[in-house]
């Protein structure tokens, strides 16, 4: 029997200078997506995809690692300037924003909070009693 060759799709390097970093910080995880100015995804990462399990996904350290991973992938495509859009109430939110600013070779142009706020919409879940 002849073995089948597995052909991997070659990653096309795009040359994009400006982009937007979307940081979604939920209570359970932190997701980071780097897009170009049109909104096409270039690179993404999350605390869960880096191997953090359970309650460790929601830590600020996991958020920092997710940002660094996503931006290192985006640097391969030539990203030099980014704007930051942050969404959600998670604990890794501030750490993620700081680690974008601390990345070498990446200039931050703007910072915007896009957390959706309900104007008396659905009833929120009941408060936890611990």
UniProtKB/Swiss-Prot annotation:
GO terms for biological process: translation. One of its GO terms (cellular component) is ribosome. PROSITE patterns: RIBOSOMAL_S11. The keyword Transmembrane does not apply. It comes from the Bacteria. Keywords: Ribonucleoprotein, Ribosomal protein, RNA-binding, rRNA-binding. Pfam families: Ribosomal_S11. The keyword Metal-binding does not apply. One of its GO terms (molecular function) is structural constituent of ribosome. Transmembrane segments: none annotated. Located on the platform of the 30S subunit, it bridges several disparate RNA helices of the 16S rRNA. Forms part of the Shine-Dalgarno cleft in the 70S ribosome. NCBIfam families: PRK05309.1, uS11_bact. Belongs to the universal ribosomal protein uS11 family. Part of the 30S ribosomal subunit. Interacts with proteins S7 and S18. Binds to IF-3. PANTHER family: 40S RIBOSOMAL PROTEIN S14/30S RIBOSOMAL PROTEIN S11. This is Small ribosomal subunit protein uS11. It comes from Campylobacter jejuni subsp. doylei (strain ATCC BAA-1458 / RM4099 / 269.97). The gene is rpsK.
